[in-house]
A protein has these predicted regions:
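N-terminal Lys/Arg-rich, disordered targeting/topogenic segments
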Residues: 1-11
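Exported/periplasmic ABC-transporter solute-binding proteins
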Residues: 9-139, 145-155, 161-338
Length: 338
C-alpha cells in the first residue's frame, strides 16, 4: 500500500514538473518573440528615419549647391550689356559660367538706353535691363528689329525720403498726386508743413521708364524743375539723404540699387534714407517675391526675337533662367523669378 502511494506521489510530482517546464518554455517563446518583433520594429523605424533624414539633407544640398563647372571661355562668351543696377547680376553670371577668376572690371558695359541702342544695332547679343521705353521700341521698329523681353529676376520700384521725414507710407494715388503736381506739401499726406521736392530722372533712363509705366500710367507726369532733374540714381540718394536740403525731398529707384548696391557704395548715406511703403506694404525681398508690394516689376533679358534656339543669345538666356542661373542670381542678392 505504501509503495502504491509512493508511486502515485512520484507520478504527480513528475506531471507537475512537466507542466511547469512546458509553461516556462511557452512563456519564454512568447517573450523572446515579442522582444524580437519589438527590435525589428525599432530597427525599421530607425532605418526609415535615417532614410528621411538623408532625403532631406540631399534636398537641402540641391538647393544650396551651385555647379561651378565652366561652360564658356571669355573668348566665346556672348557679348552682353547691362544697366547700372543689373551689372552685379551679369557679373555674377559670367563669373559662374566662365570662372571665378574673370576680371569683371574690364567688361564693356554702358547703361540702359545705350544698351538698347547697341542691341538694336547688333553690336551685342543680349542685354539685361529694365523694360524698353516707347522711344526704344520705336527705334527698334525703325531698324526692323523686334525685341523679345524676358523676365530674369523680380524687382521692386521704390520711393524713398529722408530718414527724418515723418511719413512712412503713401498710397498709389498720393504718389501720382505728388508727381503730377496736385499734391505739393507734406502736410497733405500726413507729414510736416513743408513743400515737397520731387526728384526725377532723365527720359530713357531705366528709372524714368519705370516711373512712367508702373506708377504714372495714363496720368501726366509733371515737367520737373531744372534743379529736380538728376542724371544718376546715386545723385538723387545723395540729395535726399542730406539733413539740410533733403528733408522735404522724395526720389525713386529700384529696390536692389537703393538697398544692396548703394549700401556697398556708401553705407552712411544709405542709412539716411528710408523706403516708403505703398498702400500699406513695405518693399522687401519677401513682398517683392510674393507680389504683394504694389510696384513689383522685373529686370529683363532682352534679345532679338529673330535669334534662333542655337544662337549665342538664346543659349545664354536659357542658362540664366535655368536652376543654376536662378541660384546664381539669388546668391548675388536678387529675387529670382523661378
Amino acid at each position: 500500500m505504501k509503495n502504491r502511494m509512493k508511486k502515485g506521489s512520484s507520478m504527480i510530482t513528475l506531471i507537475v514538473v512537466i507542466v511547469l517546464v512546458v509553461a516556462l518554455c511557452v512563456g519564454a517563446y512568447f517573450l523572446v518573440s515579442s522582444l524580437y518583433e519589438k527590435k525589428l520594429n525599432q530597427n525599421g523605424d530607425v532605418n526609415n528615419n535615417s532614410s528621411q533624414d538623408n532625403t532631406q539633407d540631399t534636398s537641402k544640398n540641391d538647393e544650396e549647391e551651385i555647379s561651378s563647372e565652366p561652360l564658356y571661355t571669355l573668348d566665346n562668351y556672348p557679348k552682353v550689356d547691362a544697366s547700372l543696377a543689373t551689372q552685379p547680376l551679369t557679373n555674377a553670371f559670367i563669373k559662374n559660367f566662365v570662372g571665378e577668376d574673370v576680371d569683371v572690371s574690364k567688361l564693356d558695359y554702358t547703361n540702359t538706353h545705350p544698351g538698347y541702342v547697341r542691341l538694336i544695332n547688333d553690336e551685342v547679343d543680349l542685354i539685361v535691363v529694365t523694360e524698353p521705353s516707347k522711344e526704344e521700341l520705336e527705334l527698334a521698329k525703325q531698324k526692323g528689329v523686334e525685341l523679345e523681353v524676358i523676365p530674369v529676376v523680380k524687382e521692386g520700384f521704390v520711393f524713398y525720403v529722408n530718414s527724418n521725414n515723418k511719413v512712412d507710407y503713401l498710397t498709389k494715388d498720393q504718389i501720382q498726386g505728388i508727381y503730377s503736381g496736385e499734391i505739393t506739401n507734406w502736410k497733405e499726406v500726413g507729414g510736416e508743413d513743408m513743400e515737397i521736392k520731387p526728384f526725377q530722372r532723365p527720359t530713357n533712363s531705366g528709372s524714368q521708364t519705370g516711373m512712367l509705366s508702373l506708377v504714372m500710367k495714363d496720368k501726366k507726369l509733371m515737367d520737373p524743375l531744372k534743379e529736380n532733374l538728376v542724371s544718376t540714381m546715386a545723385q538723387i540718394i545723395n540729395f535726399v539723404s542730406s539733413y539740410e536740403n533733403g528733408k522735404n525731398s522724395i526720389g525713386y529707384s529700384y529696390y536692389y540699387y537703393a538697398t544692396t548696391m548703394y549700401e556697398g557704395i556708401d553705407k552712411e548715406i544709405a542709412s539716411n534714407i528710408k523706403l516708403i511703403g505703398i498702400d500699406g506694404v513695405k518693399p522687401n525681398a519677401k513682398t517683392i517675391q510674393n507680389g504683394s508690394y504694389p510696384y513689383t516689376t522685373a529686370y529683363y533679358i532682352v534679345i532679338n526675337k529673330a535669334d534662333d534656339e542655337n544662337s549665342p543669345s538664346r543659349k545664354l538666356a536659357n542658362l540664366m533662367l535655368s536652376k543654376r542661373g536662378q541660384q546664381v542670381a539669388k546668391n548675388a542678392g536678387y529675387v529670382p523669378v523661378k
